[in-house]
Amino acid sequence: LMSKENAVKFAPVILAGGSGTRFWPRSRRARAKQVLALEGQRTMIQQTLARLQPAAQASEVWVITNSWLRDVIEQQLPEIPQSHVLAEPCARNTAPACALAAFLLERTEPDTVLGVFPSDHVVANTKRFTEVIAAGIKLAAAGDNIIVLGVKPTRPETGYGYIEQGELVEQDETPLGFKPITVHRVRRFREKPDAHTAERFVAAGNFVWNGGIFLWSARTLATAVREHVPDMAAPLEAIAAAYGTPEFDAVFAREYPKCENISVDYAVLERRSAKGEQRSNIYSLPADFGWNDLGSWASLHEHLGEDDKTNVMDGATTGLFA
């Protein structure tokens, strides 16, 4: 997203490393759900790239995946430079994946805003998505800010982490005439709750699901990693330094396993939020664009709706629930 006014560079990072076993038997390990056409004709990762296109050119997009999905992702997303499709040598959760992109870009373009987007999400209202992401980019570029997208709970779900929202700091009017984008300070991140706690969170009204979409500048995340997970910094620095050289694959394979296997939520967001609502510079924006994470057949079922025989039918998935 380059405009003459703010000239903010935006680089989306698509996370496509999951092994997709929750959609077994349709998504055996070699064909994880990201590369399946679970809804419509395009695969989930193709849909993810398409909805990012208004905000970023394909040449600016990065994909973090694994060795067995790399080839199929390169086939499905030929617009993305192959040098931007990075295959983790081992699974290390989301903190090293997010931080790797930040360390790579920090070397040359530290003010670039990175957006983290899981590849198994479905978004019904892409215009609203584009608008919320644009607001998030602007806020992430304005300083040492971390932006998280929160989903208003529709049920006391125990499968997601929750974000406890604090002070309402602004309501941006939007050019397309949708409802204003509300920006809250984040008070705390809460782990996946038990059923009783989830009911309490939903009743309280100021808790939203952590949808796993984040925005921050390369410098902000790299600096936060050095502060909160310092042992991760040296391996990632070494990998970033080797990027674009013949040694890259060897350095990646040697250094990446040294990174702790930890989510970015635990590694950075929870630790940073401990500084307090006014000092952590973490803000939540609403993921009010018809979000679903399709993490399992149950959420696909909810997303597609039911026919009168309570069988969910979709062109790409006909008969799977029959």
Predicted regions and their residues:
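Conserved core of the sugar-phosphate nucleotidyltransferase
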Residues: 126-256
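Left-handed beta-helix
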Residues: 2-9, 218-322
